[in-house]
């Protein structure tokens, strides 16, 4: 179980996340995180993985999430990647297995076999020796996904994986995400394209500083729910406004 209770985050004087409480079983499921710009979507993920110092309870498998990071893989927005760093596609992907084999060990046969399969599945074979600075947006995103899949995690966080990429790359990436779901993994994806929300996600978290809704993707994309999320703001100093949704 992935759980938060009364999660609050301040960045400077801004109250970015207000009293977020969630309870999500770790099972084969793809969950979207959606809301307007500045709603706190990326901040929620960064709070969960410890990049931001949010207050409140954060648990994975009934233990503090900071003690369980070996079970989590995070794929940041590709815009945050340093493209000037001299590293090849193959080296980036192989770095995904270092938390399991150690930073100073050569990848074993199992890792090499997995690399070969991922290069094939994500159509990166001809790019394996390219520098990441030479890649298109879609190619780079496929590399980041391949890197994430080198590790055996239970929970995957993806921050806007489909922004600025071609349809072919999006389709390849979504196929791998569906495969993770079939393996019983929990995948949470920050996403902005409402037209594909019902197609991609089993359930959706609607966020705008507070938790506006968490549940069925059909209901989440209804006019009523979207208006509540995208067109309003709530003063959550009032305890009655606290979000506490368990599914």
Task: Give, region by region, the residue ranges found by the protein language model.
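H-loop (His-switch) and adjacent beta-strand-loop-beta switch element
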Residues: 204-217
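ABC ATPase nucleotide-binding domains
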Residues: 218-247
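Conserved ABC ATPase "signature" region
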Residues: 109-127
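Conserved ABC ATPase signature
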Residues: 131-135, 139
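H-loop/switch region of ABC-family ATPase nucleotide-binding domains
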Residues: 191-192
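Catalytic Walker B motif of ABC-type/P-loop ATPase nucleotide-binding domains
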Residues: 156-159
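Helix N-cap at the start of a conserved alpha-helix in ABC-type nucleotide-binding domains
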Residues: 167-169
